[in-house]
Amino acid sequence: ELSLKAEFNRLINVQKATLDNLREAVVVFSADGRLRLHNDAFAELWELRKDNLADSPDFDAVVGLCAKLYHDRNVWTTIKSRVTNPSPEYRQQDQGVMRTSNDRTITWITQPLPNGATLIAFMDVTAARKVETALKDKNEALQAADKLKNEFVQNVSYQLRSPLTTILGYAELLESERP
């Protein structure tokens, strides 16, 4: 029995270390909607004190703590339905994007677990979105510059063609007048 208990404690420690070393903010709610597990990244992402999550609060209490950064009740209601509604149509993976009041972009995904539990993972993708936006802006600027260059070359080509045609005409005329 002692070896079973030691093995159990070891597995719990491995699980906790694994969760705490994830970049993603992870929470697990049981079928009754109570918080069962979370990692440090979750508390950091939502700017929560660890003692706020210590007594296994229910989903609504956790949302109340997170609402200072993200206020859209419709999204929280959608996530809650994935956590607390046992119906098979709600026990499915879902995902979305949040834009928080502190200008961060967070993606979220829900994943049903055995025994009615639900895992929710949040990831701060602000930096990636900023890079994506910068690359799109740069691409648009390069396309606009290329268009301007093409228009300029066409215009210069036309402007040069007209005088050259005239000069060629005079040259042919002069050559035809030579004895």
Predicted segments — roles?
Residues 13, 19-32, 44, 99, ...:
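Long compositionally biased, domain-poor regions of proteins
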Residues 65-130:
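PAS-family sensory/regulatory modules and their coupling/dimerization elements
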Residues 16, 20, 137-176:
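Primarily the dimerization/phosphotransfer
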Residues 27, 31-90:
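PAS-family sensory domains
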Residues 1-9, 113-144, 149:
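Sensory coupling linkers of modular signal transduction proteins
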Residues 1-15, 84-95:
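PAS-family sensory modules
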